Amino acid sequence: LLDKVLCVELGHMRDLQTRSIFANILLKMVYENRLTRQGRTEHIMLVEEARNIAPARREEDPPSVGERMISELRKFGEAMIFVAQFPTQVSSEIIKNSGVRIIHRLAWAEDLKLIGQSLNLTQEQLAHISNLGVGEVVVSLARLQRPILLQVRAESVLSVENRDLSLRGES
């Protein structure tokens, strides 16, 4: 299952609790697989709607099952990408422990506050995030002292051919 490109679409499941349970079962399968295959990163997992795996919680509440497995998977070389429209709906631990953060336009004050705190942004920088245009993103990398602004061209399309990822479009 993990030796090739795989997409698991959970959108047809109407009940959010069912989606969450199924997603956690898949996460557990990946976890069990990684325990037996320790070493370099061989697999990348992309989780859309990350709130279903690692929902936001109060600090005094224990981490979710998904959050604990994610923490363990990172130790075993599993690379993970989490996608969320609203950062406040995702565990703050996931956001804090991310090596790369890609931020599109955020308008809600609570989302801006969370991102501002996690990236140590000024009010001016937060105002800029709330006014980002189409294709504009702020990228934060662990090894950079401050986030950078990037423009993504719409004509660049990611394609999967023969298990190699390549960008198509103008260079």
Model-derived segments and spans:
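A short helix-turn-beta junction within AAA+ P-loop NTPase domains corresponding to the substrate/partner-engaging
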Residues: 93-105
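Conserved P-loop NTPase motor module
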Residues: 135-171
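Phosphate/diphosphate-binding loops
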Residues: 119-121, 125-133
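P-loop NTPase motor domains
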Residues: 1-68, 137-143
